[in-house]
């Protein structure tokens, strides 16, 4: 079967729409606690729990989760097993209603107009994890979402320039 069947694409599109709608609702209705000065994990926790509870009746049959822990198990030199390469997903949607199963991982990063903040998300510990599939092994897509700390005109053009540059392509 086609990895990106039309049903899978339709479900993925709906998942993204639900997440974006939840974001807009929180930004509008909970500006006191859902804003750029909060820690990233606080924002994704609130968003994840809000989606899981408030968006239960939107017609998606899968499960939302946030801050899922992932790791790799390897054999140590002494012969025992050990956990290595620990990581955490910000928000994840999973459904096995159809095959292949749909697992969408959303990673959120705070972005402003500065080079320093963009550079913090480049390389092996940044966007490369989505290119190499470290967070969404076997999935056709993973989603990195920028949380803009400044107005869109201040952040987005510089980010687009960076992503289209040689340095951005290497990241």
Task: Give the ranges of each region predicted by the language model.
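Short, small-residue-biased leader/transition segments that mark boundaries at the very start
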Residues: 1-5
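Conserved catalytic cores of phosphodiester-cleaving nucleases, focusing on short active-site segments
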Residues: 91-93, 104-112, 130
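Nucleic-acid nuclease catalytic cores
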Residues: 136-160
């Amino acid at each position: 079967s086609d990895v990106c069947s039309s049903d899978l694409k339709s479900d993925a599109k709906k998942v993204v729409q639900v997440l974006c709608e939840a974001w807009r609702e929180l930004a509008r209705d909970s500006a006191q606690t859902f804003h750029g000065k909060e820690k990233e994990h606080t924002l994704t926790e609130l968003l994840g729990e809000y989606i899981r509870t408030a968006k239960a009746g939107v017609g998606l049959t899968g499960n939302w989760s946030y801050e899922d822990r992932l790791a790799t198990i390897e054999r140590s030199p002494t012969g025992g097993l050990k956990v290595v390469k620990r990581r955490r997903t910000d928000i994840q949607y999973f459904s096995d209603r159809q095959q292949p199963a749909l697992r969408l991982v959303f990673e959120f990063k705070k972005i402003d107009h500065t080079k320093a903040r963009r550079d913090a998300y480049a390389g092996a510990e940044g966007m490369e994890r989505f290119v190499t599939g470290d967070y969404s092994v076997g999935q056709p897509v993973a989603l990195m979402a920028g949380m803009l700390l400044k107005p869109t005109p201040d952040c987005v053009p510089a980010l687009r320039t960076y992503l289209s540059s040689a340095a951005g392509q290497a990241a």
